[in-house]
């Protein structure tokens, strides 16, 4: 199904629910996990996997939401500022674009890789412009598993951005994946409690540097943008 010339991957209701979460957080039954640097995290135990899924609410004080959305979607730029990226690319498979992402894990653990689809929509909700990105793992036989890398095939994420009414952004993220293998509990807790706020700080810096990155691309020999 297409909207204009854009393939619709996820149903409209998924985007509507994500918008609602930003304006009216649905946290009944969720456990408060941590709060740091303006970021609040809740978690919910998944009985099937024995892992947690997370809801993250926060603000990015000096970055506009349209820039955040562009940085979030720009894979080439991601490879420059995210040190955990080992390999990352987008490819066309059948009627949709698919992303392959190989993430560095600390030694002696194996890297994890993801094959997934995503969709971004710019929406109007309660009189506000909102950017919503939804991603989910996908089965793509032509991108087989690799030796020494663990394939994460149970992954879902939604990210919502809007203005904070000033010069920053309000953000909401819902995240779950099953990285498989024997990952220590302390590492999982660190990633959620410390890694998420730390990542958002790094992303905020990347957003500030995005205009300069685009200018450098335009000035590069052979540039077509």
Task: Label the model's feature ranges.
Residues 1-225:
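Eukaryotic helix-grip
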């Amino acid at each position: 199904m297409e909207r204009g010339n854009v393939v619709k991957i996820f149903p409209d209701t998924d985007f509507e629910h994500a918008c609602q979460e930003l304006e009216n957080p649905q946290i009944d039954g969720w456990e408060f996990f941590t709060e740091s640097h303006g970021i609040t995290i809740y978690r919910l135990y998944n009985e099937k996997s024995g892992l947690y899924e997370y809801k993250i609410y926060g603000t990015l004080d000096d970055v506009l939401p349209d820039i955040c959305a562009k940085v979030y979607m720009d894979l080439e730029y991601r490879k420059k500022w995210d040190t955990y990226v080992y390999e990352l690319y987008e490819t066309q498979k059948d009627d949709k674009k698919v992303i392959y992402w190989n993430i560095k894990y600390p030694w002696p653990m194996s890297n994890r890789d993801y094959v997934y689809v995503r969709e971004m929509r710019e929406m109007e909700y309660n009189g506000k412009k909102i950017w919503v990105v939804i991603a989910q793992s996908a089965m793509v036989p032509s991108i087989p598993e690799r030796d020494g890398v663990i394939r994460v095939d149970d992954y879902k994420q939604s990210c919502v951005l809007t203005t904070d009414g000033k010069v920053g952004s309000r953000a909401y993220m819902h995240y779950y994946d099953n990285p498989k293998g024997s990952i220590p509990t302390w590492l999982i807790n660190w990633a959620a409690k410390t890694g998420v706020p730390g990542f958002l700080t790094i992303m905020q810096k990347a957003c500030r540097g995005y205009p300069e990155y685009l200018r450098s691309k335009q000035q590069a020999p052979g540039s077509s943008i």
